[in-house]
Regions:
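Glycine-rich, proline-tolerant flexible connector loops at the mouths of alpha/beta enzymes
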Residues: 71-83
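Short, acidic/polar
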Residues: 50-61, 114-129
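N-terminal glycine-rich anion-binding loop in soluble enzyme alpha/beta folds
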Residues: 1-61
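Alpha-helix-loop-beta-strand connector modules within alpha/beta enzyme cores
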Residues: 84-101
Length: 138
């Protein structure tokens, strides 16, 4: 989704809210965690599956109300590769539902490195960064 389309969606919904997807495992309802752990064990895979299922429910509930979501990378990265898969699947699902996605990675580096972070973040998705350091090499 382009920034122009995001602006149109904000006007259409009359809502500029960006919903944060910061799925700390302790925030997730027990029935979701229990189902994920039953299928994958109390492993990184189980935790990541719980994050993904929780996010899908939130996205389903919010997609007609808000124009954008902002998954916080740290809550996914802490679960290793399974967590990164959950982040990628969350982003894919949000985009399927018509939401603009801002990856909250709070990366903090110079412009060329920020370009690499941006390229790494799963295609047509925005990522936040440190504006001062990013401008040093422009």
């Amino acid at each position: 989704m382009s920034l122009d389309r995001l602006i149109e969606k904000i006007a259409e919904l009359k809502n500029p809210t960006v919903a944060g997807l910061d799925p700390k495992l302790s925030y997730i309802p027990d029935f979701i965690k229990q189902d994920a752990f039953r299928r994958h064990g109390e492993t990184l895979e189980g935790a990541a599956e719980a994050l993904l299922q929780f996010n899908r429910g939130l996205i389903d509930a919010l997609c007609d109300i808000v124009p954008a979501v902002k998954p916080q990378c740290a809550y996914y990265e802490m679960y290793g590769w399974p967590g990164l898969r959950a982040l990628a699947e969350t982003i894919r699902y949000a985009k399927e539902k018509g939401l603009f996605v801002i990856t909250d990675g709070k990366r903090n580096d110079i412009g060329s490195t920020m370009e690499a972070y941006a390229a790494a973040h799963l295609g047509e998705v925005s990522i936040n960064g440190h504006p001062f350091l990013s401008l040093i090499h422009i």
